Curated annotation (Swiss-Prot):
GO terms for biological process: translation. SUPFAM superfamilies: Ribosomal protein L16p/L10e. It comes from Synechococcus sp. (strain CC9605). Keywords: Ribonucleoprotein, Ribosomal protein, RNA-binding, rRNA-binding, tRNA-binding. Part of the 50S ribosomal subunit. Binds 23S rRNA and is also seen to make contacts with the A and possibly P site tRNAs. Signal peptide: none annotated. This is Large ribosomal subunit protein uL16. Belongs to the universal ribosomal protein uL16 family. GO terms for molecular function: rRNA binding; structural constituent of ribosome; tRNA binding. GO terms for cellular component: ribonucleoprotein complex; ribosome. It comes from the Bacteria. InterPro entries: Ribosomal_uL16, Ribosomal_uL16_bact-type, Ribosomal_uL16_CS, Ribosomal_uL16_dom, Ribosomal_uL16_sf.
Length: 158
């Protein structure tokens, strides 16, 4: 399971999840992706369960990229412990997810949209947040009006 090798501080405050994801909200590696629709915490166990579900479905067909990393420690107190005497010990690690964040990507020559959609659907069941399946061409259409693509170089003649 995923967890940081070492951290500067062992314990963190819980924090708030406000707004939408401004980073990690576009497809970077593959052709298909799973995008979060709401905010939440995803544990390292849930990430691993989703990864296993996808890899078992696609077998050796393509490549899967995990775009999130659980870097926030969640502490818990022992059961039946009285109040006080400090904060509990770190029990597990979570990734903080905001709406729009890309969770997983998938690509490869043998991966069709149908295979990718079914694999992502199996991964969706393992996650505690609502997600949607997106393709690279859909993303280009929505972002097409903002900036020209790299393949469409603008030439200026003088």
């Amino acid at each position: 399971m995923l967890s940081p090798k070492r951290v500067k501080f062992r314990k963190q405050q819980r924090g708030r999840m406000r707004g939408v994801a401004t980073r990690g909200n576009t497809i970077a590696f593959g052709q298909f992706a799973l995008q979060a629709q709401e905010c939440g915490w995803i544990t390292s166990r849930q990430i691993e369960a989703s990864r296993r579900a996808m890899t078992r479905y696609v077998k050796r067909g393509g490549k899967i990229w995990i775009r999130i990393f659980p870097d926030k420690p969640v502490t818990m107190r022992a059961a039946e412990t009285r109040m006080g005497s400090g904060k509990g010990n770190p029990e597990f690690w979570v990734a903080v997810i905001k709406p729009g964040r890309i969770l997983f990507e998938m690509g490869g020559d043998e991966i069709t949209p149908e295979i990718a959609k079914e694999a992502m659907r199996l991964a969706q069941y393992k996650l505690p947040v609502k997600t949607k399946f997106i393709q690279l061409d859909e993303q280009e259409k929505s972002a097409g009006a903002k900036a020209p693509a790299a393949s469409e170089a603008i030439t200026v003649e003088s």
